[in-house]
UniProtKB/Swiss-Prot annotation:
SUPFAM superfamilies listed in its UniProt record: AttH-like
Function of the molecule: Dehydratase; part of the gene cluster that mediates the biosynthesis of the aspoquinolone mycotoxins. The first step of the pathway is catalyzed by the nonribosomal peptide synthetase asqK that condenses anthranilic acid and O-methyl-L-tyrosine to produce 4'-methoxycyclopeptin. 4'-methoxycyclopeptin is then converted to 4'-methoxydehydrocyclopeptin by the ketoglutarate-dependent dioxygenase asqJ.
A molecular function (GO) term: lyase activity
Domain of life of the source: Eukaryota
EC top class named in words: lyase
Protein name: Dehydratase asqC
Glycosylation positions in this chain: 51, 103, 131, 143, 215, 264, 281
Signal peptide from the UniProt entry: 1-18
Entry EC number(s): 4.2.1.-
Catalytic activity: [(1'E)-5'-(3',3'-dimethyloxiran-2'-yl)-3'-hydroxy-3'-methylpent-1'-en-1'-yl]-quinolinone B = (1'E,3'E)-5-(3,3-dimethyloxiran-2-yl)-3-methylhexa-1,3-dienyl-quinolinone B + H2O
Length: 347
């Protein structure tokens, strides 16, 4: 018999003081010998030979104790050229976002450092010589301003186990640094807010390839109690856009020691709990049940607040729902809870 789904983080009232257990990992080993059969060198994928997507979700605690969820995402895949950023105050649940399309650029030919973004001060910069063990991310719009530096103090998650998966009819490559040490500041209103690095972390995600999905929901989840992190993919291809395929439903699970497992999942969105956007005329589920049989896991994932949609002028650039989520339930047969990010995109 399945245990009752716990509520924990998910039932905090809107005005509650946020007290999420944000903390970076403290891995200090070599990424050149991670003991996994990756098909590429992580540093090489930050070069100009690879376009695609650079993204971060940062779970921030300020020096004064306030907590925030910060998103930065640059896409340059030959079709889309867009930068998105947002800040969600986890106490007031006030959401701010910035969207800029066009005139983006990225450079990283050795020995130069990665620079990927749109306009001045909006995007990603490699600080370390390998372009990924220390990085900087910025947003300079008055509505969303931050300057973060993060360090790869976390064991990587290599999506699919080797770094390549079939998303629809085509290959996609993806790797992540899920719990980086993070420093810097945000500006909220007129206040500059310094970050407490010991109580903050960043998930850096790098992805490229053609892919074949016309809609998807992706999660990056943390289980603080056990040190597990999960990259969960779900998606479909519309029959009028490509040949019908089996829907994408899988998770890559990385444990506290860095071991990776690729698992089938069952994914059920709660269509009675949705956010409908008048600007896009699309509906976004806000709650989901995810089952991972090989981990004796069933979790209920919930968006912390309804509107976390980042949208532009509704031209050729797709909008994205990049939301802070919490979850609770069962993992490895024991009660668990955690937090993470969800990305929902409809092309």
């Amino acid at each position: 018999m399945r245990p009752a789904i716990l509520a924990a983080f998910s039932t905090l009232p809107a005005a509650a003081k946020a007290t999420y257990p944000f903390a970076p990992e403290t891995f200090d080993g070599s990424y050149k010998d991670i003991g996994l059969p990756t098909i590429y060198d992580l540093s090489a994928t930050q070069s100009t030979n690879y376009n695609g997507s650079w993204a971060t979700g940062s779970w921030i605690t300020s020096v004064s104790g306030g907590q925030y969820f910060v998103v930065s995402h640059y896409v340059n895949d030959g079709i889309h050229d867009v930068y998105r950023s947002s800040i969600l105050d986890l106490s007031s649940l006030k959401y701010r976002y910035f969207f800029q399309a066009g005139n983006g650029s990225y450079t990283a030919s050795p020995p130069s450092h990665l620079k990927a973004g749109v306009g001045k001060g909006n995007g990603f910069e490699g600080i370390s010589n390998d372009n990924y063990t220390t990085m900087r991310v910025q947003s300079s719009h008055p509505n969303v301003t931050f300057d973060l530096t993060y360090h790869a103090t976390t064991k990587p998650l290599i999506n699919g186990g080797a770094g390549v998966v079939m998303l629809g009819a085509s290959e996609s490559k993806q790797w992540s640094l899920p719990a980086c040490w993070t420093n810097g500041f945000l500006i909220v209103g007129d206040e500059q807010i310094p970050i407490d690095p010991k109580r903050s972390l960043t998930w850096y995600d790098r992805q490229w390839g053609t892919g074949g999905l016309t809609n998807w929901t992706w999660y990056g989840l943390h289980i603080p109690k056990t040190g597990h992190v999960l990259s969960i993919w779900t998606g479909d291809t519309d029959a009028d856009r490509a040949a019908p395929i089996t829907p994408v439903r899988f998770a890559t699970v990385r444990n506290a020691y860095g071991a990776q497992t690729v698992c089938n999942i069952t994914w059920i969105p709660d269509l009675s709990h949705i956010f409908h956007s008048d600007s896009t005329n699309k509906s976004y589920p806000l709650a989901w049940t995810v089952e991972i049989p090989s981990y004796d896991a069933i979790i209920k994932v919930k968006s912390r607040t309804e509107n976390q949609l980042n949208t532009g002028s509704h031209g050729s650039e797709p909008e994205a729902y990049n939301g802070f989520v919490t979850f609770a339930g069962q993992f490895q047969g024991t009660e668990t809870e955690g937090f993470g990010i969800v990305e929902i995109v409809y092309l």
